[in-house]
């Protein structure tokens, strides 16, 4: 009897010891070194791709996907992103340092079999329809993240120059600037635009094409593609499309669509000798800009735009894709068109880019929902915090275009909605009581919706700052200094006051990991000493950190 108990206690003690050791290993990973080591291999993959040495590419990809540091970064990405608390079909979560370290050590291509995705349906923005979402297991997510590290250098090196979606260091504002350059010149710029819409791009890409053309381990890729999904306890196979909700899916989709720009250049910019000829380029005025599966083609005449449409249709057909005839239309620039949430239109030969009506309606709808439905019982400071998050996100996206009128309109809408919110909370109070309860004078501003600690952002105080477009040929793995400077400059333009000072003091680098931060991505303030000791507003005590790095830091402190 005693022997039985001692054996059980011994196993429990051994298990606890193993967990403690794994936990310590996870906490002691040097993430800065991990980034450096993986980046070194990625640079070698880029150079091998440029030299078209595909055997070297394959060999280096193998080294990277079997590297400890690459596996650690893959697991880190999975356990720090927004889906870290959502399990796949196996119900497994990596929510302790020991489980995370065990995952790093268990990632392998040997005998790998991807589990089916867990299918759920989520509401679309218009709330009338629901769209399907596939949730892979944590292990499959980590495998995708690992192989994405090896595939991304190839994708970046072979990508179209005017492709901006789901790519390192590129954004919608870059696409906007390239379109501005193509369309803004008086009497010279192209008059016609082909607005492209691909039917269910991510869902219909041919598996045969992907397996034949994507430079990565074919067995692993096949597992990603053929995993299937489970809905209401029934297994459904996947015969086409990229892994839904998968980390690697945007890279696969981009690589599928890369080549459209080259095809258009060959047809409209080259002479009989196959060389780019400025005479043809200037006569046809064909330009191509793509963001993920949305694209625009400019042309001198509607006939050229339709010819470009047929070339793109042929290109897509080889990949199992097709254009939507209803949504792929040729438009005159004087009538205007919408792209990436902006409206592009010429008024008396002057190009104006502003937030589209659809984008304005969407933010008004979201704010209305926050104030009148979700926030009807919130305290004022909670409501202010939630609204400021929405306002900052929207204004940061649109502040590089002619958005002053839209910003002023949003201020007016906010006032009307907040007055309804306040009136609903105090139906028996008069206007004077409500106004003095919720609106105050702050500095030289009257009627500020505020509390003692928080105040609502004034939307039209957002400065309009022209975005500096990226070099089309820039590679994030080879031109690291260029991309780091762009990130730093973007922060200096967008931040103000103490936040700008913190950013400048750190040179835009994360305090925890030392890697560059992007001002448009998630970040938070880390306090070196407790706020109670130094005060909330002491800049010397404040540092910017990646949210992911802060989660790991907080977790490690908690476990200690």
Predicted segments with their positions:
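Short, flexible, mixed-charge glycine/proline-rich loop motifs
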Residues: 498-507, 535-540
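Extended C-terminal regions of large enzymes
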Residues: 413-495
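A conserved non-catalytic segment of reverse transcriptases
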Residues: 226, 232-235, 319-383, 389-392
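Conserved polymerase palm-domain catalytic core
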Residues: 106, 110, 158-162, 167, ...
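Charged boundary/loop elements
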Residues: 24-83, 149-165
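Histidine-centered nuclease catalytic patch
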Residues: 514-547, 551-553, 558
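Non-catalytic, peripheral interaction segments enriched in hydrophobic/basic residues
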Residues: 383-429, 436-438
């Amino acid at each position: 009897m005693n022997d039985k108990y001692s054996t059980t206690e011994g196993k429990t003690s051994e298990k606890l010891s193993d967990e403690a050791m794994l936990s310590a290993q996870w906490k002691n990973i040097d993430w800065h070194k991990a980034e450096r080591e993986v980046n070194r291999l990625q640079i070698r993959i880029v150079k091998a791709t440029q030299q078209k040495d595909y055997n070297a590419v394959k060999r280096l990809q193998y080294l990277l996907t079997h590297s400890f540091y690459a596996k650690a970064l893959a697991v880190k990405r999975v356990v720090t992103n927004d889906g870290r608390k959502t399990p796949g079909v196996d119900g497994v979560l990596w929510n302790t340092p020991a489980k995370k370290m065990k995952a790093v050590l268990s990632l392998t291509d040997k005998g790998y079999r991807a589990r089916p995705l867990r299918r759920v349906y989520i509401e679309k923005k218009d709330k009338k329809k629901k769209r399907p979402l596939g949730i892979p297991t944590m292990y499959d997510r980590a495998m995708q993240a690992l192989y994405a590290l090896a595939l991304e250098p190839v994708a970046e090196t072979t990508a179209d120059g005017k492709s901006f979606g789901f790519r390192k260091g590129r954004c919608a504002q870059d696409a906007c600037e390239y379109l501005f350059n193509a369309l803004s010149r008086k009497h010279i710029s192209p008059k016609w635009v082909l607005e492209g819409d691909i039917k269910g791009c991510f869902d219909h890409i041919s598996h045969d094409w992907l397996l034949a053309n994507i430079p990565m381990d074919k067995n692993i890729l096949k597992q990603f593609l053929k995993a299937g999904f489970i809905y209401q306890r029934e297994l459904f196979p996947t015969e086409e499309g990229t892994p839904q909700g998968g980390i690697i899916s945007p890279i696969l989709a981009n690589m599928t669509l890369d080549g459209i720009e080259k095809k258009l250049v060959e047809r409209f910019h080259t002479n009989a000798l196959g060389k780019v000829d400025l005479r043809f380029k200037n006569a046809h005025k064909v330009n191509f800009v793509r963001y993920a599966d949305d694209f625009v083609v400019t042309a001198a005449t509607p006939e050229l735009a339709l010819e470009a449409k047929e070339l793109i249709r042929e290109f897509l057909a080889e990949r199992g894709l097709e254009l939507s005839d209803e949504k792929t239309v040729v438009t005159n620039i004087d009538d205007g068109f919408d792209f990436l949430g902006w409206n592009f239109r010429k008024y008396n030969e002057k190009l104006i880019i502003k937030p589209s009506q659809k984008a304005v309606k969407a933010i008004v709808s979201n704010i209305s929902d926050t104030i009148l439905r979700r926030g009807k019982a919130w305290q004022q400071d909670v409501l202010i915090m939630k609204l400021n998050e929405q306002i900052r996100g929207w204004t940061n996206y649109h502040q590089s275009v002619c958005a002053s009128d839209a910003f002023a309109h949003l201020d007016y809408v906010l006032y009307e909605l907040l007055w309804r919110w306040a009136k609903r909370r105090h139906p028996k109070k008069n206007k004077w009581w409500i106004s003095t309860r919720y609106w105050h004078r702050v500095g030289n501003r009257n009627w500020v919706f505020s509390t003692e600690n928080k105040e609502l952002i004034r939307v039209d105080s957002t400065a309009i700052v022209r975005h500096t477009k990226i070099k089309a040929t820039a590679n994030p793995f080879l031109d690291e200094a260029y991309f780091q400077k762009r990130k730093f400059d973007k922060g200096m333009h967008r931040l103000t006051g103490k936040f700008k000072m913190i950013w400048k003091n750190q040179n835009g680098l994360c305090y925890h990991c030392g890697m560059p931060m992007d001002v448009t991505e998630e970040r938070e303030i880390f306090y070196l000493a407790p706020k109670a000791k130094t005060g909330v507003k002491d800049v010397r005590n404040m540092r910017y950190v990646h949210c992911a790095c802060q989660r790991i830091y907080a977790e490690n402190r908690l476990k200690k």
